[in-house]
Amino acid sequence: METSGARTMTAGTFLVALTLVVLVLLLWHLRWVLLVLFGAVVVAVALDVLIVQVQKRTRLKRPQALAAVLGILLFAGGLLGQLLVPELISQFQQLGRDLPQLFSKVSDLLSSEPRLAQLNEALGEGLNLKGLQPLLGFAGGAANSLIQLFLMALLAILLALDPSSHRRMVVAVTPRPARQQMELLLDECRQALGGWLSGMTLSATSVFLLTWGGLLLLKAPLALLSALVCGLLTFVPTIGPTAATLLPTGLALLQSPQLMVSVLVFRLVLQNLEAFLLTPLLLRKTVNLLPTVALTAQLSLGALLGLPGVLLALPLVVVIQVLMQRVVVQQIMDRWA
């Protein structure tokens, strides 16, 4: 009898392990579908924040409020595009002319320092034709990304149009004893993600405007383009602000080393203000992300999924942190006897 029970337990354990392996492989093969779905959830939460604000100030029902939000966003995007796109196109063209000069100047600076000569040779070898051959598939990748963005936007609109139905579906597939906890968990995830998105949007907008104004005062080249890059990369904490500083600093080097130092000091001051004052102030009511956790998530998802993984790493960490606190810590660890 004991042998039969042991065999049954072994067979059951094997089936559970096999099921988990198959599930992990299935999730890995569907990773891009899951990435698009999670991106749609993030965008839907961002739309929901705006929809709630519109409904508080008007008597519009949700479909009309969603249409109003989309109309406002399209109008604002068109207005900003009309004002900024011509200047951005001009600055992109200027950037294309300046980049060869910048690479040449950096190469000359590296060559003048014996200890950096090997780095210069490595960069030169890395920029040859063989190193650029993988870029030949850029057009196909761009088309695939556009399709994914379109599907993400469509899913986000559908989710924002009727979130309660999708919420009921998630609760319905949850075991009955845990349904109330699932409802609370969904509320907390939505609140945390909405707060993070609102705070980061305000932070990115502030960084864009302050960088644009500061670079204009310093008379740095391509101020609008550099400020736009700095603002967008604010959504990628830890890595983004540091990487964004390279563009205005490098372009300033083409004019003079003094201007480069001025731009670098300005960006460092602004980056520290954003990291230690602005972002904590805007995100004080949402989850507190540790820099080590944020950086690890960005590196891990970036290695697995590329740029989309880096962009969605922080929203995913926000949700996972809520899940860890409410499920793992409170439901498992705190009850461990």
Can you describe what each PLM-predicted range is?
Residues A40-A44, F75-A76, A156, L228-T242, ...:
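Hydrophobic transmembrane alpha-helices
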Residues M260-A337:
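Hydrophobic alpha-helical transmembrane segments of membrane transport and translocation systems
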Residues R31-G39, L217-L228, S256-S262, L289-A294, ...:
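Membrane-water interface of transmembrane alpha-helices in multipass transporters/channels
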Residues L60-V69, L116, N120, R179-M182, ...:
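Membrane-interface starts of transmembrane alpha-helices
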Residues H29, V33-L37, A46-Q53, R57, ...:
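Membrane-spanning helices that line or support transport/gating and their immediate boundary helices
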Residues G12, A142-L253, P257-V265:
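Alpha-helical transmembrane segments and their immediate interhelical loop/hinge regions
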Residues M1-L83, V318, V322-Q325, V329-A337:
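Anchoring transmembrane alpha helix of integral membrane proteins
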Residues A6, L50-T58, Q64-G71, L79-L151, ...:
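Juxtamembrane membrane-interface segments in integral membrane proteins
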